[in-house]
A protein has these predicted regions:
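N-terminal segment of the mature soluble domain
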Residues: 50-54, 58-59, 68-129, 140-142, ...
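Short beta-strand segments at enzyme active-site cores
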Residues: 108, 148-149
Length: 208
């Protein structure tokens, strides 16, 4: 009986020590040195500001577009060349979202979207369930003017604990994010930007 009460008491104490809170997604994240949400926001934000203000895209041929002369973009990938498992799709999604909101760009669907589009067109044309005058067909998609793609790299350095450092370990990570915008017709690089981050973590003899 006493043992059961002790277990219940311990469970109550442990439960009281845990909590879940909502927080500001834009708050600076400093829990670990690993790539995190703040890094994603900073890198994407810097690229978007640079691309929107670029003068190199003003000379693109806009013939055949009708009244809407905005640049049509295909969002390529960001290659992860770091040692970390980083979902770079989150970076490209963030960039595409902010560029769309700027009102200066149009985007065509990437491969994942093309699969869904193809499936829907085949359904409309072959199922017999869709009105003929509303059926969509292949061959009417917009052609992208440019493609955006890039790479994320990192350089990591570690210094182990020592008597001189008081048992403190130090880790330094440098991130380099490059992105370029290429004219699909000519393969000319119209814009290129680089964003950098450096993070340092010091860990005491008893860990984080």
């Amino acid at each position: 009986m006493k043992k059961s009460l002790s277990i219940l008491a311990l469970a109550a104490v442990l439960g009281a020590c845990s909590s879940v809170d909502y927080d500001d997604p834009g708050r600076t994240e400093t829990l670990t040195i690993d790539f995190g949400s703040t890094d994603l926001q900073n890198l994407a934000g810097g690229m978007v500001e640079s691309l929107i203000s670029s003068q190199g895209l003003n000379y693109l041929d806009s013939s055949g577009k009708g009244d809407d002369k905005r640049i049509i973009v295909y969002m390529g990938g960001v290659e992860n060349r770091t040692s970390e498992h980083i979902d770079t799709q989150g970076i490209t999604d963030k960039i595409q979202n902010q560029l769309l909101k700027s009102g200066k760009f149009r985007f065509v669907a990437a491969q994942a979207g093309q699969d869904e589009i193809g499936e829907q067109v085949r359904f409309q044309q072959g199922s017999g369930r869709v009105r003929e005058d509303m059926m969509r067909s292949f061959g009417k998609q917009l052609g992208a003017d440019v493609v955006l793609f890039g790479a994320l790299r990192s350089i990591e350095k570690r210094k182990g604990s020592s008597i001189e450092s008081g048992g403190v370990r130090k880790e330094d990570v440098y991130y380099q994010f490059t992105l370029q915008c290429v004219n699909i017709d000519t393969a000319e690089i119209l814009w290129m930007e680089e964003e950098e981050l450096r993070k340092t973590e010091r860990t005491g003899p008893f860990g984080r």
